Amino acid sequence: MQIGILGWFGVPNAQSAVLAMLVPPLLLWALRKEKFWLLCVTAFLGFGLLYATGTRLTYFSAVLTAAGMLVLLLWNRKPLRFCLPLLLALVLLLGLKGFSPMEQRQMRSLDSNELYREKTEAVMGSDMGYAYRKGEEIPAEVKEKLERLYTEVYGVPGPYKLPLLGDMIEKFGLEAVMEAYGYTDAPEQLYNARLKKLKCLELNWQQKDFLTKMLGFEYAEATVNGNIYDPENDFPALLYYYGYLGAGLYLLFAAYFVFSALRALFRRGPGFVTLELGAAALMFCYALGAAQFSGQTLRKPNVCVYFSLAAAMLWQQSHPVVRNRPQVDRKSVVFLKKI
């Protein structure tokens, strides 16, 4: 429980995204039932699960959902008693942040960084923390230390016998890898698995021709010495796998729903801001946010199905169906009255 309840889902990032997107419509369902006890139960279960999951995405989405739904209730002048569970959840989430599984997970990451910070200090000495500026010449002594750091510390398998930068150095060369990382010696970057995946595909991308960059390259390009470096962040992955053309079309399609909602807001005014719109907007924003900052969202069918649902809800709210009443002529009305 100290590191959250991850594990029942195939991909932890995808699990967090699904939970974040499901809580707003769950609360909307309870609010539309207009039963206070039902709202209390759904708020407890929804926010409790987000808090206990132990990722930054679920924790911050819980805070934003509680605050967002609270504002929507006040905006739509709903009974104040429905605000109480959301207000209580918001206070508890903020007050118990220091005890959350998310904080415990972050502390463990800091412990790993501290281990490599000591190794970095042993190699870099007084030059630790060197800040490279693009275009400047690196002092020979500092560059020699950086080369030792990248090869002797990060060029060998890590604590879990997994490669750090060794396979990338073998494929792209030491100088290219050092340049990709900006000649940094920071453990927060060099020991960051998420960043490593992005750097690996970035180096691959730099070697491609114009046509490949327009259409993207295949998934096999993310494999180095049998290790898969498929990026966790979805937006860079869209660019690398589908090129400028595919990524541009995807973003334009997503932007259409945002444009539709903003246009409807401009035309219909404050009355357009309803609980239904708020729940859809939260789901939509969480999907985009998870794609950029967490990942495994846009490219997983079992996750992006909820993104599609949010987009459909946004479109439905922006394009209400107007039912035309049947026209009755004046003679028919007179005839009916006589009868």
Task: Give short role names for the model-derived ranges.
Residues 29-40, 71-82, 263-269, 314-339:
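Membrane-interface junctions at the ends of membrane-embedded or membrane-associated helices
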Residues 66, 280-288, 296-335, 339:
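Transmembrane alpha-helices of multi-pass inner-membrane enzymes
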Residues 22-30, 247-268:
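Hydrophobic, aromatic-rich transmembrane alpha-helices
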Residues 154-242:
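Long extracytoplasmic/lumenal interhelical loops at the membrane interface
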